Amino acid sequence: MNFLSHYSSPLGPMTLTSDGEALTGAWFDEKNRFVSTLANDAVEQELPIFTETGRWLDVYFSGREPEFMPKISFGEAGAFRRAVWELLRAIPYGETVTYGALAKQLANPRMSAQAVGGAVGRNPISIIVPCHRVVGANGSLTGFGGGIQRKLALLKLEGIDTAKFSIPKKGTAL
């Protein structure tokens, strides 16, 4: 069974999902391409994992790095996506990394930054699995499902100097 809850963030409302034990999704509502991943039987119910996730998000949005992590699950995701999402979890608070650097960390010489970008773009647990910390090699702020302005706001919240980044005129997840 799947469960859902809502969180009111300073950047807009978010939907949280769980399998009953772990967090399986967190995304901004109006960019919710993940809604199709919810089973028809998803029940809106407050669970301990949602309370814990809400506390984590409260700390995060206060401008501090949370000292705890809610339990998360990537469900039925394939090995490649899981590997990329685990790399995302290792990106330190207040730092960024490029798609190409993530590809190199996978230790597969045939892996491209574009393939990594595809997996990053399918990250179902926004902010907590920090896909917003990934930028283009040229400093472009591309590819955040919550929108580029939110990505910029999240980076600023973490104390990152965003002057070195550029916002694409058109492209992904604007």
Spans of model-derived segments:
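Short glycine/serine-rich loop segments
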Residues: 111-153, 162
